[in-house]
UniProtKB/Swiss-Prot annotation:
Gene behind the chain: aspS
Function statement: Catalyzes the attachment of L-aspartate to tRNA(Asp) in a two-step reaction: L-aspartate is first activated by ATP to form Asp-AMP and then transferred to the acceptor end of tRNA(Asp).
Family: Belongs to the class-II aminoacyl-tRNA synthetase family. Type 1 subfamily.
Subunit details: Homodimer.
Region (Aspartate): 195-198
Binding site for L-aspartate: 171, 217, 447, 488
Organism: Aeromonas salmonicida (strain A449)
UniProt keyword list: Aminoacyl-tRNA synthetase, ATP-binding, Cytoplasm, Ligase, Nucleotide-binding, Protein biosynthesis
Protein name as it appears in the record: Aspartate--tRNA ligase
Pfam families per UniProt: GAD, tRNA-synt_2, tRNA_anti-codon
Annotated binding of ATP, by residue: 217-219, 226, 481, 533-536
Compartments where located: Cytoplasm
UniProt-recorded Gene Ontology molecular function terms: aspartate-tRNA ligase activity; ATP binding; nucleic acid binding
Record-level GO cellular component terms: cytoplasm
Amino acid sequence: MRSIYCGQVNEAHAGQTITLCGWVHRRRDLGGLIFIDMRDREGIVQVFFDPDKPDAFALASELRGEFCIQVSGVVRTRPDSQRNSDMATGAIEVFAHELTIINRAEPLPLDFNQVNSEEQRLKFRYLDLRRPEMAKYLKTRAKASAFVRRFMDEHGFLDIETPMLTKATPEGARDYLVPSRVHKGKFYALPQSPQLFKQLLMMSGFDRYYQIVKCFRDEDLRADRQPEFTQIDVETSFMTAPQVRELMEEMIRNLWQHVLAVDLGDFPVMTFDEAMRRFGSDKPDLRLPMELVDVADLLTAVEFAVFAGPANDPKGRVAALKVPGGAELSRKQIDEYTKFVGIYGAKGLAWMKVNEAANGIEGVQSPVAKFLSDEIVREILARTGAADGDIIFFGADSKKVVADAIGALRLKVGRDLGLMENSWKPLWVIDFPMFEEDSEGGLAAMHHPFTAPSNLGPSELKANPLSAYANAYDMVINGYEVGGGSVRIHNSEMQATVFDILGITPAEQRLKFGFLLDALKYGTPPHAGLAFGLDRLSMLLTGTDNIRDVIAFPKTTAAACLMTDAPSFANQAQMSELAIATTVKGDE
C-alpha cells in the first residue's frame, strides 16, 4: 500500500511519484490550498492538495486529525523561503494526486498539542503511542535489542529460552502465582529471573547463554520499576569475574556508540565500601562533584552529643558534605532539606556556611560553631575543600542513616542547584558484602543465595558470614544500576552452607532446591553471569526519566493496566475449575 515512509522522503526523491500511508497529524487551509502534515512511525512530511486535482482536493476538505489515509503524489523541493529546518523532511513536500480515506477518527480523548495526564495516556495508550516522541522511544529500544542480539551472536552466545511457568524461589520479592488446573491446589510461579535455569544450562555444557526475557516481581513500584520487566540475561562457564565484566563493558560501550554515537571510555571500578563511604550509595552518580567526607575523628571530644555520640560509636558515623555555592541557600531552603533527610531517618541536619574560609571559625556561620574550636573548623574546611560561598552539611547517626540521608541529600541538592554535569559516568561496583542483617535479626543474601563468596571456603564462611564479601559486580550508569551479576556457587557443600547461614533448613533445601543441589554433584563447571535491565538501559538511551515511556503497554504504580482494566476478577466457573476461592468478592 505504501512505497516509502513519511519520515524518509527527502530531496533525492524530487520528481518521483510516491505512495504514503499514515495519519493526519495537522491540517490547515491556506490561500485555496489544503496542507496536511502526514505522520507515520518514521516521521512527518508535508502534503498539499491543489484544486487542479479536484477529486483529491474535495476529499481533503473532509480530513481531520488522526484520520488514517493513503496519499499518492509527486515529491517537490520547497523554495528556500518555505523550507522548515525543524522537520527532517522540511526541504520537500508532496503534491497529492490521489487520496484515500482508509478510516475516519472520532474526536480524540487525548490532545497531542498539550501535556496529557498520565492516567489518560495509559488508558488510551494506543493513541499515546502515535506521538512522535513515543515512537522515537520504542524505536530506540528496538535498535538496542537488535544490537544486543548481534553482539551476543558474534561472541558465540546461544539464545536459549527458559520456562515461564516454574517454581517459587526466594529471590527477594514476592512471586506472581499461577494456579494449576491439572494439579489442583498447586501453583506455578512466574520467574523473577531465569537464575537457576541458566545455571543449569551451564551444567548442561552450554557455556555461553543469553536471552532477552520477561521477568516478574510483585513488589512496590516506583518510576524505574514495573511488575513485569525485560532482562538481557547472560551466563558463561570458564570465565572469571573480570573477564565477564570486560566483555559486558565492551557490549555496553558499543551499544552507546551505536545508538548515541557516544564514547563511554573505560569504566572505573569501585568497591562497595568505597562507594558507600564517598557517595552514600552503592550506585553512585559520578556526574555530581560532591562527596561525603569523614570527620568523626575530629569530634570525639566536643561537648555536643549530636556529634560526639556517633563519633565515639563504632557503628556510628559523622560525615560532611560540601555544596559549592550553597551559602546562598536561605534558612527556609535549609529547613526543607532538614525535612527531606528526616525521610531517611536523620534526626536533624547541621550546617555551616563558609563566608571567609581563611578566617577559620570567625569566617563561618553555623548554629553548631559554638561547640567547635577554631582548629576543628579549619580542619573540616581543609578536608572538605570548602571555599568562600560554600555550605557544609553534616550527617551524624548510624552508618546506615548517614549513608541513606546524606547520600540522598547529595543528589537532591545537586539537582536543585544545577551542579549535575551533562555527561555519561559509568562504573563497576564490586566486592559487595555477602550477607546483610534483615529486620528480624537474621541474615539475608545481599544479591541472591547462589552468589559465590570471594576466596572463602565453607567453614570460613560459616564462622564469620558478616565479614564475607561476595564475588559480585554491578554496572552503574549515571546513578542507575543497569546490570548486576556474580560468580556463582559451583559446589554443593558451599551451596548448602549458604542455605544454612540464611536459615533454610535441610528439609527446606531439599524441597525447594533439591534439583540444584543434585545437579551440583555432577561435574559442575565454574560459571558467572549477569543480567541487564533492558527497560532501564532504554530509559537512559532515550533520555526519559520514566521507565513507562520505553514500554509499549506498561502498568501504573499500582500494578494495573488502565487500558485493559487488568487485573480483573475471575468468574466463579473459572475459580471452581481451578479449585481455588477468594476472600474478596468482585463488588468489593
